[in-house]
C-alpha cells in the first residue's frame, strides 16, 4: 500500500450491480477511502423483447452508490470487449477448443481497459468483488492468494494478472465467506442484498448457448463414433461439445457390447469433423499424463526458464493436482503426479504454491505417456 491515508487514497470500484461489488464499495467507503463506482458496459445484451439487463444492473449500481454516498459513472467497453475477448472466444471455438472468456475478460477488460480508465479518474487503486487476496511482502512484491471462501475462490480466473496490475488492485472481499457478504449487504440495507448471483458467460446470460453460438459460427454436423470405429449417430457441430461431457449426446439409451455405462465425449477430430465418444466416466482415453500450454503469465517476476514442483487446477473449483512444470519463456510443459481426467485444450491451467496463485497458461495439447492424445 502507498503511504497515503485512506482519505487521500482514491479507489475506483468496478460495480456490476451485484451484491459482491456493492459490498466491496461499502467496505471501502466505511474504511475511509475516496471511493468512485464505475459500471462497465461490455456487451449489448438487449433481448428479443427489447429488455437490456445492463440497464437494470446500472440502476442497481446507482441505487447502491446513492445509498452509501459515492459518485458513480458508466463506461462503455463494448468495442474493447468485442476485439479482445469475443473475437478470441469465437476463434477458439473455430479451432475446436473450449475457451475461457472469464480469464480473458479479467486480463483484457477489468484489469486493463478498466484499470486504464480508473487511472484517468485519478485512482490509486481499482477494486473488484472477486474472492481473492493480495499481500505485499517486505520487498514490495505483491502475492495473490486464494480467497478465504474455498468454494468461491476466483484466483483461477485472475491467473493472468501481472505484478503491475496486482500492485494497483484491492480485493476487499478476499478474507470473507459469501454468506458473510450477504449479511453485510442485508445489515446495511443495500438495494442488491437479495439479488441472485449472475451465472454463466456474461455475454450469453440466460440465453441458450447452442443457439447463441450458432448465430456467430455456422454449425457443421458430422459423425459421432467410438474409437473402435462404430458409428453411433450424428453430432450437431464439434463446437458444441467439450472433452468429458456427458449430457446432450442423444445416445443415452444405446448400450455397448459389454456395459451399460453412460457415454462421454472422449475426443474430437477437426480434420474429419468427427466426435468420438466412449462409455464410462473413467474411460481410459479421458486420462492424460502431461500437457503443453502457452500464453504463460506469472503474477510476479520469474526466471525465463525453470522447473518447479507445485500444484495446479485445470478447471474452476477443481481440487489441486500435484505437477512439475517446465517453463520456457511464455510456454510451459506440465507433468502430472497422477493421470488427470478430461484435460481440455483452450482452458486455463493455473499454478499454486500453497495458498499463492503463481499464474497460469492456456492449454494447447495433452499427452499420455509422451504421446499426443489422439482426437482431443
Swiss-Prot record:
Pfam families, A to Z: tRNA_Me_trans, tRNA_Me_trans_C, tRNA_Me_trans_M
Catalytic machinery residues: 105 (nucleophile), 202 (cysteine persulfide intermediate)
Keywords: ATP-binding, Cytoplasm, Disulfide bond, Nucleotide-binding, RNA-binding, Transferase, tRNA processing, tRNA-binding
CDD domains in UniProt: MnmA_TRMU-like
GO molecular function, one term: ATP binding
Gene Ontology CC terms: cytoplasm
Interaction with target base in tRNA: annotated span: 100-102
Catalyzed reactions: S-sulfanyl-L-cysteinyl-[protein] + uridine(34) in tRNA + AH2 + ATP = 2-thiouridine(34) in tRNA + L-cysteinyl-[protein] + A + AMP + diphosphate + H(+)
E.C. code: 2.8.1.13
Residues engaged in binding ATP: 14-21, 40, 129
GO biological process: tRNA wobble position uridine thiolation
Cellular compartment(s): Cytoplasm
Class of this enzyme: transferase
Region Interaction with tRNA, annotated ranges: 152-154, 315-316
Residues the UniProt record annotates as site (Interaction with tRNA): 130, 347
Top-level taxon: Bacteria
Paired cysteines (S-S): 105-202
Function description: Catalyzes the 2-thiolation of uridine at the wobble position (U34) of tRNA, leading to the formation of s(2)U34.
Similarity remark: Belongs to the MnmA/TRMU family.
Name assigned to this protein: tRNA-specific 2-thiouridylase MnmA
Origin species: Lactococcus lactis subsp. lactis (strain IL1403)
Lineage: Bacteria, Bacillati, Bacillota, Bacilli, Lactobacillales
Gene: mnmA
